[in-house]
Structures are given as structure tokens and as C-alpha cells.
Amino acid sequence: KIPVVAAGSIIDGRGLAAALAFGAVGVWVGTRFIMSTEAHAHQDAKDHMLDASIEDTIITRSYTGKPCRCIQNERIKRFEDNPDQIQKFPLQYMQTIQDDVFGTIGGKIKEINVNEDCLPSGQGIGGINDILPSKQIVDNMISQASSILTNSNNFISN
């Protein structure tokens, strides 16, 4: 039996419970932990992401040359309007590093420009409404998933 770890839009206990119910042995949580107090992301990036929804994201190759979902901004728009300017990986990635716009992926914590820097974001971004310590995120996730899975037994037994 091959263990499966679920990923994608897992931001709370509902996603964890669903993944476990489908047979996953665990989950990979991305965007939710960018929105934690310990994350090495600039506070302006976190604040900007708090205001975002799925409609504010786009899958783009403009930062690395490979597809990545990010919060839309002016840099992405310039590249998406001129896709021939997007280089293949690793050239686009190297250009992004040279331009110093790797944002939260690069661990930028001093200065960030939300109109230029990369703000990676999963589809669950609109469901994140606070910035919490990682321990609280995990505790909340486990508590909510446990409650959901316990209550789901009632559906089967009734």
C-alpha cells in the first residue's frame, strides 16, 4: 500500500477531514502556513493576501517559467499580455531572482512590492481570514477535522 498525502486548498479541518475520508494518510498545507505569524513573508504580503479571493489569483509562468498560482499583479499582467517574453525554466526563474521580485517564495521580509513581487497562493486563499501562530493553525485543523469525522459516524449508524 502506497501512502498518499493530499494537497490543494487544504486550509482548515474540513479539508483535512475530507482528505482522510478519501484515504490520505496526511495533508500538505501551503498557503495557510504562509499566513502564519512565523512565516518568513513580509507583513504587507500577508495583509494583501488576507484581502484576496480565488478570483484574484492566476496560474502563471511569469516568475519561474513553470506554472504557479499567484495573486495577480501588474508584473504578471505585463507578462501575460506578452507571453512571448516569458522564458522557459530555469531562465525565467533566474530573471526573477535577478529582478529581486521573488517575494514570499524567496523569503523577502524587509521590503515587498505587491504589484511586482511573487505572492504564491492556493485556491483556498479566500477562506483564510486571519494570521495565526502555526501551532494554533494545526490545533484548530485537528480539532475541526476530529469533530467532523466523529460526527460523520452518526450518518452511517443512523
Give the positions of each predicted feature:
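Conserved active-site-proximal phosphate/metal-binding subdomains
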Residues: 1-5, 10-158
